[in-house]
A protein has these predicted regions:
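Glycine-rich phosphate-binding loop and adjoining beta1-alpha1-beta2 segment
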Residues: 51-94
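Hydrophobic/small residue at the entry helix of a nucleotide-binding pocket
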Residues: 38-39
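Glycine-rich phosphate/adenylate-binding loop
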Residues: 2-6, 117-121, 126, 131, ...
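Conserved N-terminal Rossmann-fold NAD(P)-binding element of oxidoreductases
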Residues: 32-34, 57
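Conserved acidic residues
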Residues: 104-105
Length: 259
């Protein structure tokens, strides 16, 4: 892409952040882990903000039940790999962007091989608290910048989404489990008054739970059940919330990279 073409495509970004900041973004390499309700929107925002290299990591295929919250889910993409559909979209947005596809799930075993210091930032959009904790601990101990996202399910009000240190979230069971795991299993700051130094996007909204009779309320159903945001059960979800989680994460990453 010629300098003129790049400036036409991202002139609005330059006029907002400045030329020096845009060059930093153009030279940045950012990983998005989990290309779902949060990660798909985060990847989109990165591409539309002139980030030069993006690595997408996820093993899932697109399911029809992803339609309510995931950017890549359309009638034409059902059954295709999320990383493939998303990579094609990102390169259509910015043909200069290099997009690496890793069609795999992150696990505690493969984190050291997949997450290295080649990344200027890692965006964690995983929904498994043990894997999230392993990823954050790896980044912490290897001085790789990471931002994590809390639970986006069961919430309706995107105006309550904010960023704080992972130790300071509230009304977020996923973030609570992650920080407990970090302290108990990974040795991060067992002093509860000390911060982790890891940004977390979360919502201060109280989650609502689906009830057996088809209603929703802030009380957990009597029979228990899943509290995950998955395809067939557990929390419901809204694009307005999951997308905002992704956008807020990218806004923080861009701010940190261009300061």
């Amino acid at each position: 892409m010629s300098p003129e073409s790049f400036d036409h495509r991202f002139g609005g970004t330059r006029r907002l952040y400045g030329q020096h900041a845009v060059e930093k973004l153009r030279n940045a390499h950012i990983a998005v882990i989990g290309i779902g309700g949060v990660g798909s929107w985060a990847a989109e925002a990165l591409a539309r903000t002139a980030v030069g290299t993006i690595t997408l990591i996820d093993l899932d295929d697109i399911c029809v039940t992803n339609t309510n919250r995931q950017l890549h889910a359309t009638a034409d993409t059902i059954g295709q790999a999320k990383v493939d559909v998303m990579a094609e979209r990102l390169q259509a947005i910015n043909p200069e962007c290099t997009v690496h596809r890793i069609d795999d799930f992150i696990t505690p075993d493969n984190i050291p091989d997949l997450i290295t210091q080649q990344f200027d930032y890692v965006i964690d959009a995983i929904d498994n608290f043990r894997v999230k904790a392993s990823l954050i601990a790896h980044c912490h101990y290897n001085k790789i910048k990471v931002i994590t996202t809390g639970g986006a399910g069961g919430q309706m009000d995107p105006t309550q989404i904010q960023v704080t240190d992972l130790t300071k979230t509230w009304h977020d069971p996923l973030a609570r489990k992650v920080r407990n795991q970090l302290r108990d299993q990974h040795g991060l700051n067992k002093n509860t008054k000390r911060k982790f130094g890891v940004d977390c996007v979360f919502s201060a909204e109280q989650s609502v739970y689906p009830q057996p009779d088809g209603s929703v309320c802030q009380q957990k159903p009597a029979g228990g059940g899943s509290q995950k945001m998955d395809c067939t059960s557990g929390f419901g979800a809204s694009t307005m919330v999951t997308a905002t989680f992704g956008f807020v994460a990218v806004a923080r990453v861009v701010k940190k990279l261009t300061q």
